[in-house]
Structure formats: C-alpha cells, structure tokens
C-alpha cells in the first residue's frame, strides 16, 4: 500500500508530465535504461514532493539528475512540490539557452 507521500508524489508527477507533454516514468526511474520521474523529448525531470514548508536540496540529487539527463541527451530539471507550490529548477546555462531560443523565435514573428 502506498503512503500519502507516495500518492501525492505520483499525482504531481502525472500533473507535470501532462503539462510538459511528456510521460511519467514507470517505477520512478528505477530501471537502468529509463531514469527520471518524467520524460519529455527535451527534459528529464526528477520530482520531489513534500507537504512541509522546507526541503533540503543536496548536491547529490542535482548531480544524479544532471548525469542521467546528459546520458539521455536531455536537459535536467528538478521539479519540487513544496507547501502547495510547484517549482522547476534548471541549470543556469539551460535557462540562458531557453531565453535565447525564445528571443530568436520572437524575432522571426
């Protein structure tokens, strides 16, 4: 039987996958060839949920998703559902690349 935290985490993974146009990874990335919790064509998302007001982000969590995303030719994203608010954490270089892409697209319109 799943705990309340597991149920909430799966609910948020499903929500994020739908919003990003991706799919939730079976077994939350436990298989060697399908890492991350949510996969899109561009992003590999590791998702963390807590009903608490704080959450510690350890370097090991970030390093894990970065390494898995690089091996999968995707951008790493850490999705966090914290105290009823949702956040996505990306590498600074990826954020700058996304901003430049948006600028270029706007110029073509």
Region annotations inferred by a language model:
Residues 1-109:
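Catalytic phosphate/metal-binding cores of nucleic-acid and nucleotide-processing enzymes, i.e., regions
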